[in-house]
Amino acid sequence: MATGKAQKKDKLRHAEYYDFQEIQDKLYADSSKGKVFKHLVEIIALPENIRLAYRNIKKNHGSMTPGTDGKTITELATLSDEQLISSVQHKLDWYVPQSVRRVEIPKGNDPTKKRPLGIPTIMDRLIQQCVLQVMEPICEAKFHDHSYGFRPNRNQQHAIAQVHKDMQRSNLHYVVDIDIKGFFDNVNHGKLLKQLWTMGIHDKKLLCILSAMLKAEVAGIGFPEVGTPQGGIISPLLSNVVLNELDWWLASQWEEIPTEFPYKETVNPNGSVSKSHKFSALRRTKLKEVTCVRYADDFKIFTNSYQNAVKLFHATKSWLHERLALEISPEKSKVINLKEQYSEFLGFKLKVIPRGRRSDGRTKYVVESHIREKSIAKIKPNLKRLIYDIEFPSQGKRTEYQAICRYNVYVMGIHDYYQLATKVCDDLTPFALSVHKSLRARLKERVKTAKQVRKRKLPCEVPKVIRERYGKSKQLRYVAGHAVVPVGYIRHKPPKSMNRKINSYTPEGRAEIHKNLDRIDMTVLHYLMRNPVLYRTIEYNDNRLSLYSAQMGKCAVSGKVLSIGDIHCHHKVPRYLGGKDNYQNLVLVCEDVHHLIHATNPDIIRKYMEILGLDVPDCLWATYRFPAVLCSHVSFRLSVRQATSRVIMRNSTNNLQCKMPYLGARTCHRYRK
């Protein structure tokens, strides 16, 4: 999980890379204007869209999970560009999906309960990704603003922030908790297709393809008549389409209700529209004040009185049954007074407590939130298991260093997510002592305190991210010279509301995204920690983390944001020339830059320089038709921190001096534009 991070850019960057962004922008703009779409399959079958889909799914860990045909992304990788495109286009002509592999995973802490997952074949997943990339901008323009699950640039933190706002600022202290019984397994296919038609998707061929996806055979069970398979790439989008109608129905009861007088609306700094004047007028009427916050199928309906909450409970129950053919779980659905009871949402439990007086003399209530008991019950055994892996790394099929990395990543992930709870320190402190005792009991003298390390001058390696976040903690421990993140060292961080200006499908919205690129993506950093490069030194893997933090998550040459799968660690002085794995000799670059550094063929060099937007004077190419000749005679005089450096390239007959970003040995004359 990421904290204070830039939004995930992988799909956005890939769309720009394959020149598909303009098409998605137009789909979004047309959908916002209420236009209908009749020829979407032609867009889905475009080579650019298919290439983009392949790039997006190949980076997922799930791409290595086989379907019923036993194939993974590895098999697709063996196909040529033309073969892959023609295969997808041929399947789209008359789409018949292969059977779906059914897998059951544990549901919650109850071992008797299982959650069924449907895993399509890798080719069907690729086609679903192609469809998703075209449908998503159309649907995004129609979705309600208070829906946060499975949508680009939105996450759990934004949903929690909206809940805080409704409870604390809007003083809506009664909540209707509704749990839909088996939502994903009971979606009505006919109703879903009609909802897509209402959204403007009038391409009958696409609707037939979607119907075929929904009715794909489940191996060993048969053909489903209802439900969307959990595990399919397109299922989250379709689930949002189903419940989008509920979002707008609830909004029509209060937020979107028309008024005779056009009240003034102002735009907040985060891009949201303030309707405070309209709401003030509505509160003077007998209308029921109601707002809804939804994350996937988990949603909260807030109101200002118990009577209104009871009415909304029964109205919503009837609406779900009549409109969407969905039933609620009577055991889990209820009305809660937030002044007296906690309400659970996204792993937290929340209520309001009195805290002073407001300006009008009334009692002021603020949000108090904890980690819910079920979530805490999962954390402790997981930590004990990770400590066991550190004690016996060979039994866990990983090295001691890898086991420590996995432990640290897990603890930092807990901190990153649950720091949104106001009482997170109180929740984690009780078993932080238990975890510390477990470390001491299992690892014994292998565990050292920071004081012992300093006093005995023991060698230790602390990645920059751990040093910055936990360096001042007395709870920090060391095992074999590696820092072990303390569980109890955490403080509350208020949830940050979503910036409504951000939008992946408008130029202005993408400009807002790019403003945030100077912050580090903790998800990528966690990935690097969790996946050290095997058969490389510990110094090498630790320096990867330090470099990612020091370079602000960007390529040292192009300045592009580095994403999982696109991070290459380059030795400035090659190892075969005596280069070491020390920090000064390493630099993180993207894949294209790394290919350019090691390229020797002039055509390949030109290709990558065009991709990266670099320029070489014509006179240079005229003089040196084959720059590979020069590559073996390159020496450098520069500093790592400098944006450019002077490079002296020598051969037997010519000397040339030019400025270039510092890359290292085998680098030819590269120029920035």
Q: Where is each model-derived feature located?
A:
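A conserved non-catalytic segment of reverse transcriptases
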Residues: 215, 220, 324-396, 403, ...
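Non-catalytic, peripheral interaction segments enriched in hydrophobic/basic residues
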Residues: 401-466
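Conserved polymerase palm-domain catalytic core
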Residues: 142-146, 151, 158-328, 335, ...
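Extended C-terminal regions of large enzymes
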Residues: 443-535, 638-640, 648
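Short cysteine-rich loop/turn motifs with clustered Cys
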Residues: 537-568, 590-592
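Histidine-centered nuclease catalytic patch
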Residues: 179, 559-591, 599-609
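Conserved pre-catalytic core of RNA-dependent polymerases
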Residues: 12-233, 237
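Polybasic, low-complexity binding patches
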Residues: 576-584, 596-637, 652
